[in-house]
Amino acid sequence: MIAKIGRITLRVFILVLLLLIIIDLVLGRVVNFRMDDSGLKSFFHDRKMEPHIGYYQSRGRQVRYLEVGDQQKATVLFIHGAPSSLSYWKGYLSDSSLLDRASLYAVDRPGYGYSGLGDPLPDIATQASILKLVLDSLHKAHHPIVVVGVSFGAPIASRLAMDYPDLVDGLVLVAPPLGPGLERIFWFTYLVENPLINWLVPPMLKSANREKVHHREELTKMLPLWSRIHVPVIYLQGMEDGLVSPSNAGFAKAHLVNASSLDIRMIPGKGHLIAFNEKDRIAGAIREMLDRCMKKRDGNL
């Protein structure tokens, strides 16, 4: 009996290891979850654009960010999910319809890209405090400031609006896990945290998994704070999202009670990756939010 259990345990271990290797090969190499500075510059130079790529230190962390566009215009800050990096947003950062309206910023969140890959920081409030420096210290960002968060980036965008209400003028939340427990937990999520396995985990997945393990706890901390959000919010999600429960829309409606407006847009037949396969729709929502916030600041709304 003991020998049988041992064989089963060994098979599970080997299966998990093979799965991690396959995921790393597919996600880490086939899909560009991070681009180095040279690759990013080449991407934008090919489009006749000159990005600014910078690094800064905060709370003992080095953080990379990218800025493109006219800094005298309004501001959009993009916050990626997990696993990912600021290169996730390159199609948006080079979108002329957004650049006509705003200066565009994106960051590698702590633990991703070139902000300490594999060294995760699950604390959402701390992440928000680190990312806000892009807007109020490194650059004197022009208002209105719209923050766009996708997946795990959405709670961080929301926390920015909660903790720094004078900084954020509008939120666009894409496939957002907002309610504690309203997201998919994989069968291997907690197993991967075992030290016997964790050292084998690819760095980007180590960060994503650590955030996943602590996400419910972090979102629970935010439960009393949603009433702090007074800015307009656009919420977008695929109705067939298999990673983040569509019931998060109901959570948003129940908790964003003081948002000046809440526009929930559920997209039929679409899953979690709407930032990729519904880019025009998402970019359109960002333009709408910018226009709405600009009218409000001009006193026309």
Region locations from a protein language model:
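Catalytic histidine-centered segment of alpha/beta-hydrolase-like enzymes
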Residues: 270-279
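Active-site loop/oxyanion-hole signature of alpha/beta-hydrolase fold enzymes
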Residues: 106-145
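Flexible "cap/lid" loop of the alpha/beta hydrolase fold
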Residues: 155-158, 162, 171-197
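Short alpha-helix in the alpha/beta-hydrolase fold that links the catalytic acid
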Residues: 245-255
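Short beta-strand/loop motif that positions the catalytic acidic residue
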Residues: 229, 235-237
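Conserved HGGG/HGGXW glycine-rich cap/lid loop of the alpha/beta-hydrolase fold
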Residues: 71-114
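An N-terminal hydrophobic leader/cap segment in hydrolases
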Residues: 8-55
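Acidic catalytic loop of the alpha/beta-hydrolase fold
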Residues: 240-244, 272-273
